[in-house]
Amino acid sequence: MSLFQTPTRRQIDAALAVLRVVLGVTFILHGGQKLFIYGLDGVTGSFAQMGIPGAAFVGPLVAFVEFFGGIAIVLGLLTRLAALGVGATMVGAILAVHLEQGFFNPGGVEFPLALLASAVALVLTGAGGYSADAVIAKRIGVPEASGRPETVRERARRAV
């Protein structure tokens, strides 16, 4: 593989699988910590103490989105939706908690920003070929993206 060579579909799929597993496991652990260690009452109290509005609703919601969204991301199941959900939790965390800590300081935006960027990448790309999404798409006959817009002629041929 050359430094300047365009990656193959397999390489892209492998890279997306690595990204999904690392991001998903990270969210499973963070959501699991909220659900099973702190508990929903602890999460609600912590969110209220940080001044997050609607802590009784938002705290448990974040815990569930992180935990179950992480599982979905690892499996590559409804990946774009799951990544959108965990990405939204990171936007909230950055704005409500981490931004005032700066970038490098403990509790700063560095880590949640990296998680947000990873989630956005999955929203944009989808899960890749090594995923439940790919299996489902193949079974229901969703055509693979070609990297270019479909022409009117191609669309007409497919419709017949």
Predicted features along the sequence, with ranges:
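Extended, low-polarity transmembrane helix blocks
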Residues: M1-L35, A56-F64, F68, L75-V160
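Membrane-interface interhelical connector segments
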Residues: F36-G54
